[in-house]
């Protein structure tokens, strides 16, 4: 399992690189990477385990964040509905956003990142809806439509695979500026 000491911090060149495509079938090393990325999220979202291991809670973790420049990320969006189901959970490999809404969305609280220790205030404009194509750990192709928070989380993680950090999207002169029609997500 990854610990906070394993998370690469802002300033490390791997966070600014274009990650390499992952080949199938997955090597044992890539299978372990996928397992460890998801395990971090599962453990970090359990308050007792998070405290025990000194983790910061996360909803996404990309391979470059642990020093591996490959197009792989884990996403575990916590349940918001009473049924207890996550709106999106998977290890996404070689993900591509194949369509996106014109409608922009942003989190009211801004975004954070396990690789960025400082608070960077401001709205991070993203697409409110996306269609995502990716492969899972078994090499099966998936295409899913996501909106609101799950769409934002996936865009954040995919940015990591292309050497982009969330604060690159913030308007430097007016960090809290937004279009009138931007959807603000709690």
Curated annotation (Swiss-Prot):
GO terms for biological process: co-translational protein modification; translation. The gene is def. It comes from the Bacteria. This is Peptide deformylase. Binds 1 Fe(2+) ion. The active site is at 157. Its EC number is 3.5.1.88. Fe cation binds at residues 113, 156, 160. GO terms for molecular function: metal ion binding; peptide deformylase activity. Keywords: Hydrolase, Iron, Metal-binding, Protein biosynthesis. Removes the formyl group from the N-terminal Met of newly synthesized proteins. Requires at least a dipeptide for an efficient rate of reaction. N-terminal L-methionine is a prerequisite for activity but the enzyme has broad specificity at other positions. Its cofactor is Fe(2+). InterPro entries: Peptide_deformylase (IPR023635), Peptide_deformylase_sf (IPR036821). Belongs to the polypeptide deformylase family. Pfam families: Pep_deformylase. It catalyses: N-terminal N-formyl-L-methionyl-[peptide] + H2O = N-terminal L-methionyl-[peptide] + formate. The keyword DNA-binding does not apply. It comes from Levilactobacillus brevis (strain ATCC 367 / BCRC 12310 / CIP 105137 / JCM 1170 / LMG 11437 / NCIMB 947 / NCTC 947).
């Amino acid at each position: 399992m990854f610990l906070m000491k394993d998370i690469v911090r802002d300033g490390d060149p791997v966070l600014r690189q274009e990650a390499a495509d992952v080949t199938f079938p997955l090597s044992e090393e890539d299978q372990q990477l996928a397992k460890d990325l998801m395990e971090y999220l599962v453990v970090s979202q359990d308050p007792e385990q998070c405290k025990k291991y000194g983790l910061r809670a996360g909803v996404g973790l990309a391979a470059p964040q642990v020093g591996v420049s490959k197009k792989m990320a884990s996403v575990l969006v916590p349940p918001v509905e009473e049924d207890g189901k996550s709106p999106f959970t998977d290890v996404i490999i070689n993900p591509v956003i194949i369509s996106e809404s014109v409608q922009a969305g942003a989190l009211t609280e801004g975004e954070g990142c396990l690789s960025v220790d400082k608070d960077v205030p401001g709205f991070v404009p993203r697409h409110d809806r996306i269609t995502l194509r990716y492969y899972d750990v078994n090499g099966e192709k998936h295409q899913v439509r996501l909106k609101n928070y799950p769409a934002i989380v996936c865009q954040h993680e995919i940015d990591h695979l292309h050497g982009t950090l969330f604060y690159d999207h913030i308007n430097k002169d007016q960090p809290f500026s937004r279009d009138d029609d931007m959807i603000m997500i709690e």
